[in-house]
């Protein structure tokens, strides 16, 4: 364990939600293992220079692009990094990767000071992963002093695979089947479905980006990339990949896209139930994914399958900053 890891070891786990802690006796080790690669990039100017060259903004110093350890009053600190929403250079923000500050008024106020150290990038706000969305929003909104404003970015929905397997089968389960699909074909099909959806949901690309062939390679290599069939007819794409994060182990949803002719019939839940039965899950593994709170069809589908909100990313805007649009 590095000195930085030891410093963050206990305090940063305040930001891990209760369900995650309840689901696995190894949650703390899982959390530290997930965090460590980001800690290893603190001060890594080689990595920072690579990101600088890719983004092409007039900020030359590679150390400013690397993950950074920011010292805060009262002996607190935060590991942070400059990021760009959907790789859009007009939407810079600072990611709070880990911190010794607490998820309370004092902690949020401390973290608000981080943005000044990134003035070269003109960040709009901070992004935080909070253990309980409603609590975090209430704390910020009802603070006796103005510490800023906040709104959700992405919800993290998860549940142990063993519990999901115990759920009652969806009415459409028997009509649905899955068959392996190569990444190129799956990506093309997904792109078609997203284009079709965008006509009725113009903000879709702010919520979700269609998985491309490269991003589906991992799911395919794990035999977890499928075409969804309904009564033998193509209906969409579903994919998952082993990804451990936030203190849990398990499988992250990489894609689920249902075409217009099959939407609204419970096909998504049935497809998820078929996928669950193909996961090579260990005892404490979960199925999880990120969903934007305005993406109501995806949110309803995930919750109908039994997944629950276990934490969330929020945009936190201290006074004097522009903030991130929904």
Predicted regions and their residues:
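Short amphipathic alpha-helix that is part of the acyltransferase structural core
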Residues: 1-54, 168-211
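Acyl-donor-binding surface of acyltransferase catalytic domains
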Residues: 2-16, 99-188
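Conserved donor-binding loop and adjoining core beta-sheet/short helix segment
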Residues: 18-121, 235-256
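Conserved acetyl-CoA-binding loop-helix of GNAT-fold acetyltransferases
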Residues: 106-116, 258, 264-281, 299-304
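Short acidic/polar active-site loop segments enriched in Thr and Asp
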Residues: 124, 285, 308
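Conserved beta-strand-loop-alpha-helix junction that forms the acyl-donor binding cleft
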Residues: 128-136, 288-299, 303, 315-320
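A conserved beta-strand-loop-helix scaffold within acyl/acetyltransferase catalytic domains
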Residues: 201-256, 260
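C-terminal region signature
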Residues: 320, 324-326
């Amino acid at each position: 364990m590095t000195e930085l890891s030891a410093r963050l070891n206990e305090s940063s786990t305040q930001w891990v939600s209760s369900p995650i802690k309840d689901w696995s006796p190894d949650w703390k080790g899982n959390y530290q293992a997930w965090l460590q690669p980001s800690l290893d990039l603190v001060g890594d100017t080689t990595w920072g220079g690579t990101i600088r060259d890719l983004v092409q903004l007039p900020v030359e110093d590679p150390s400013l692009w690397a993950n950074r350890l920011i010292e805060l009053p009262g002996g607190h600190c935060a590991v942070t990094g400059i990021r760009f929403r959907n790789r859009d250079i007009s939407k810079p923000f600072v990611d709070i990767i880990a911190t010794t500050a607490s998820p309370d008024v004092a902690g949020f106020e401390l973290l608000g000071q981080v943005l000044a150290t990134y003035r070269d990038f003109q960040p709009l706000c901070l992004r935080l992963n909070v253990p309980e969305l409603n609590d975090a929003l209430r704390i910020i909104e009802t603070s006796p002093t103005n510490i800023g404003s906040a709104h959700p970015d992405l919800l993290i929905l998860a549940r142990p695979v063993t519990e999901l397997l115990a759920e009652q089968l969806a009415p459409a389960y028997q009509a649905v089947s899955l068959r392996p699909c190569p990444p190129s074909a799956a990506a093309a099909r997904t792109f078609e479905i997203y284009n079709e959806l965008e006509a009725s949901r113009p903000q879709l690309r702010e919520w979700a980006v269609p998985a491309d062939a490269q991003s589906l390679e991992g799911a395919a290599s794990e035999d977890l990339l499928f075409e969804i069939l309904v009564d033998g007819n193509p209906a969409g794409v579903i994919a998952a990949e082993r990804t451990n994060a936030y203190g849990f182990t398990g499988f992250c949803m990489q894609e689920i896209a249902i075409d217009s002719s099959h939407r609204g019939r419970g096909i998504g839940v049935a497809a998820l139930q078929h996928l669950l039965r193909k996961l090579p899950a260990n005892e404490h593994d979960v199925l999880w994914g990120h969903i934007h709170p305005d993406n109501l069809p995806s949110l309803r589908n995930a919750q109908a399958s039994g997944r629950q909100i276990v934490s969330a990313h929020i945009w936190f805007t201290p006074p004097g900053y522009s903030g991130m649009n929904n």
